[in-house]
UniProtKB/Swiss-Prot annotation:
Domain HMA residue range list: 1-66
Purpose: Part of a cation-transporting system which is associated with copper export out of the H.pylori cells.
Gene3D superfamilies: 3.30.70.100
GO process annotations (BP): copper ion transport
PROSITE patterns: HMA_1, HMA_2
KW Heme (keyword) present: no
Protein name (record): COP-associated protein
Recorded superkingdom: Bacteria
Stored Pfam families: HMA (PF00403)
Gene from which this protein is expressed: copP
Length: 66
């Protein structure tokens, strides 16, 4: 499954690295693409990962969904 999540507050490579770290820790995530210009994160995943878990990881990293 592939989802595109709007994320507020990402401004630099450190933000990209932090999102990739938190989301990448979820089992089942196979791809993470962070687009600073569009303020979005694209994630490809399969079970046991879920859209809800990915959104929670982004929130845990300190960013807002939007």
């Amino acid at each position: 499954m592939k989802i595109d999540i709007p994320v507020k507050g990402m401004t630099c490579q450190h933000c990209v690295d932090k999102i990739e770290k938190f989301v990448g820790e979820l089992e089942g995530v196979s791809y993470i693409g962070v687009d600073l210009d569009k303020q979005s994160v694209q994630v490809e995943f399969s079970a046991p990962a879920s859209a809800e878990a990915i959104e929670e990881a982004i929130l845990d990293a300190g960013y807002e969904l939007g």
